[in-house]
Amino acid sequence: RANHYPALDKPPLPGQLRAGAHSDYGSLTLLFQEEGLSGLEILNRQKKWTPVAQCKPEMIVNLGDLMERWTNGRWISTLHRVNLPDTNNNPNQSRMSLAFFHQPDWDARIECLPMCVSPGETAKYSVVTSGRHLMERFHSTVLDVDDSTLSEIEEKNKNN
């Protein structure tokens, strides 16, 4: 997905962001940004928003929700957001990025990998298909659909 965040044409509102806090739905995201034009921040273990360092053109790898489920929470889905540019330094800065989201096949079973469960430990997450997880996340963040509609969408995708 190509993302374009236009330059600000007026001062931002308090707390305004270019993209609010979220984790990615799939297993992994590859992100490419313009050199020196970040704004990307991650929530660190101390629960503080931390800018992602921007050096030369580079690829940023974010782990997504399904990777967290596969690893039983050993690898964490990265909570991130895109902040506004520093209005003192460059208020007219636009930002572009290119993201590749890896989403396993619709019917792929997402369950804890055996190597990620210690003896006596149980899986933290229930088994789900990749498609069901995607639809549940869309439902909770974007779409206004009920469970029967989610089931219809799943059924339609199975037949394609």
Model-predicted regions and their roles:
Residues 1-160:
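C-terminal flanking tails of non-heme Fe-dependent oxygenases
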